[in-house]
Regions:
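C-terminal catalytic "cap/lid" subdomain
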Residues: 1-214
Length: 214
């Protein structure tokens, strides 16, 4: 939901892409973040009271559930009828649909962390992170004109840039807790933008625009 507006064009293209891949037998777990909605609520709460980190995290988790319900409805019958949150309670053998949509589960990290936990349970080694930023940069490109794209980086280097401390609502390409788990599990995370054609290229093993962390 960039700038408070639903990206309808992106959702239509994503649904078409996943529907086509599903027809070939591919299956998807989509974990939704809280995005700008989460940050708006967190900031609003901070201006009224002094919330604990746990309270801010729970508020963020519920915004991810709203986003997940929305995405689940977008995919209709392709999607599992309920959203998921707890990776430990997710029964892989009972997963019959092409798509499962989920959100956050518990405080202490973003949905990036939950994504890695689901990937570990499913035995996946590659995770795709879709956002409104096409690449990882050396600095925030919105603030610094000399920011440079990073197309490939190790987990050690990435964690050195981002640190290891999680703060509720923090805006980073991939959260510190999830990064630590992904590194330990020897996973790769592809940071891609919202260009579905680019996403298709990645899945097809073609040249794509984005950053790979491994």
């Amino acid at each position: 939901v960039p700038d408070g507006k639903v990206n309808v064009a992106f959702l239509k293209q994503l649904k078409t892409f996943i529907t086509r891949r599903a027809a070939k037998g591919d299956r998807f777990v989509i974990i939704c973040g809280g995005g700008g909605t989460c940050r708006i609520y967190n900031e609003g709460l901070r201006r009224v009271i002094k919330p604990t980190k746990s309270e801010l995290d729970w508020l963020g988790i519920y915004t991810t559930h709203l986003n997940a319900q929305f995405v689940r409805l977008v995919f209709g019958k392709l999607a599992h009828p309920t959203i998921v949150g707890d990776h430990a309670a997710f029964e892989v053998k009972r997963w019959k649909t092409s798509v499962v949509v989920g959100g956050g589960h518990k405080p202490g990290g973003s949905t990036d962390t939950n994504t890695i936990l689901f990937a570990k349970k499913l035995g996946a080694k590659d995770v795709v992170n879709i956002s409104n930023v096409d690449f990882l940069y050396t600095k925030d490109p919105r603030k610094f004109k000399d920011a440079k794209k990073i197309t490939h980086i190790s987990w050690k280097e990435y964690r050195g840039m981002m640190g290891d401390t999680w703060t509720p609502g923090m805006h980073v390409p991939f959260d510190p807790v999830a990064s630590r788990l992904a590194q330990a599990a020897k996973m790769r995370v592809a940071l891609l933008g919202s260009d579905v054609k680019n996403l298709s290229n990645f899945f097809a093993g073609k040249v794509y625009k984005g950053s790979m962390i491994e």
